[in-house]
């Protein structure tokens, strides 16, 4: 993705990845022997009007049906899922809107979207219920007294802002 205003190129944006999850309804916990699953591109479609342009990526992803009985790895049996990614550029708006459409039939996993920025930043901004929250990128230092190790993922609803004076 290239920012035509700055010339900055973002490589590796919108990477769909799926990982196992053996945590509870509150906490993500990856299985000891996890496998990362990525989708395959099936087709692309574009729609263009005077106001916006949308690229639709139709993907398929083969997800393990669940974790194994021991819950330390993912099952070898998989289900194929359709997944659509819509990337929309609106005229005069300096951002790309990304929507992911996916109907889940698998258990014990987490589907995510990664956006590499290549930027060196100390914090990021996230939308909360009533405010824009600023959080440090680096995880806090831990020791043996921590019952639960911190994770880099944080709650957000509709956007994340990772930027500095170079772009974002």
Over which residues does each language-model region extend?
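Catalytic and substrate-binding regions of extracellular carbohydrate-active enzymes
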Residues: 1-101, 113
